[in-house]
């Protein structure tokens, strides 16, 4: 069957359902596809179809994730739903499912629970900009005041983690009721999607951001100079533009891109996603290496000390058999290179067990081009034992 062309006429947004186990995330995902399918904007996916999430591998970690897509009048959405709590933690920290916004599902029968809080914290750490709330199972609560209390609790919780608790849309509904076609609850799903359309900002496309390309390989063309190859991570680069070589050394070095080529063809410019070779003026083979990045001057700096949110793999996932402690020195893999670093655990945390999610300080032995939101893996003897996201650089 021929593949359908991807429709670029609508802005594309990545969202996901988050919240405590059994509060109705997957049922809500199914309900959204059903309500939008009736308007011609989706293909209906039932609960079993979404819950039976395929395994994916990201940074050497197996994650179960379901992806569904649907359209509203204004946007095209890719929606992720994870069956288990650990899958959310891994998904968000590895960036396997980049989220431009979240739908926080809270059962009105229960109110906020431990994973509700944990998912909000994770969303804050990995930089999810906005959260819309869906109070589910409202058909099972007779007392309106009870729902008011739950809403207040959720708003307070969002505010506690620096989200807009006062301004966030909170929709009351029943995902199961909507799946069963009850008009009142179908209307709640329509209200939810209108809120998502309006409240969650359209993300800046990768190609509109500032230029950055991790260096994967370096070689010399006799008579022409040094070429750095890699995949453009974001932004665009034109021939004769100035770039900086950043990382592994304290001082960034400026140079000019005098030529670009892809698949042996010359280019005037390259953009996010392109695998290119960049010819660099006045740079000798020894002064650039894999693990550095080419970037728009002044946009990224090399750092050795950072705060990070880290997930330690379980033994079954190929992680460590035993916990690690303060001053642990593994390899930290950023973009294209491994650098040794030392782990400094927060006060009160003596050790990190396989399967734990922890905030820590990392001190690298060499400076690396990193910024808030940069993803990395933690490796030991060539195998991945953890994944992390930079929360802040120091």
Curated annotation (Swiss-Prot):
Annotated HAMAP family: EF_Tu_B
Catalytic reaction annotation? GTP + H2O = GDP + phosphate + H(+)
Enzyme Commission number(s): 3.6.5.3
| Presence of the UniProt keyword GTP-binding in the record | yes
- Sequence ranges assigned to domain tr-type G in this UniProt record: 10-204
Q: Where is this region: G1?
A: 19-26
Query: Could you name the Gene Ontology cellular component terms for this entry?
Result: cytosol
Q: Name the segments for region: G3.
A: 81-84
Q: Describe the subunit structure.
A: Monomer.
Q: Name one GO molecular function term.
A: translation elongation factor activity
Per the UniProt record, the source organism is Mesoplasma florum (strain ATCC 33453 / NBRC 100688 / NCTC 11704 / L1) (Acholeplasma florum)
- Subcellular localization, as worded in the UniProt entry: Cytoplasm
Q: What is the lineage of its organism?
A: Bacteria, Bacillati, Mycoplasmatota, Mollicutes, Entomoplasmatales
Hydrolase as UniProt keyword: yes
Q: Which family does it belong to?
A: Belongs to the TRAFAC class translation factor GTPase superfamily. Classic translation factor GTPase family. EF-Tu/EF-1A subfamily.
| Residues given in the record as GTP binding sites | 19-26, 81-85, 136-139
Top-rank taxon, per record: Bacteria
* Chain positions covered by the region annotation G5: 174-176
Q: Which residues bind Mg(2+)?
A: 26
The cross-references to Pfam families, in alphabetical order and at most eight, read: GTP_EFTU, GTP_EFTU_D2, GTP_EFTU_D3
Protein name, please? Elongation factor Tu
Q: Which UniProt keywords apply?
A: Cytoplasm, Elongation factor, GTP-binding, Hydrolase, Magnesium, Metal-binding, Nucleotide-binding, Protein biosynthesis
Q: InterPro entries annotated for this entry?
A: EF-Tu_GTP-bd, EF-Tu_GTPase, EFTu-like_2, EFTU_2, G_TR_CS, P-loop_NTPase, Small_GTP-bd, T_Tr_GTP-bd_dom
Annotated region (G2) at 60-64
Top-level class of the enzyme under EC nomenclature: hydrolase
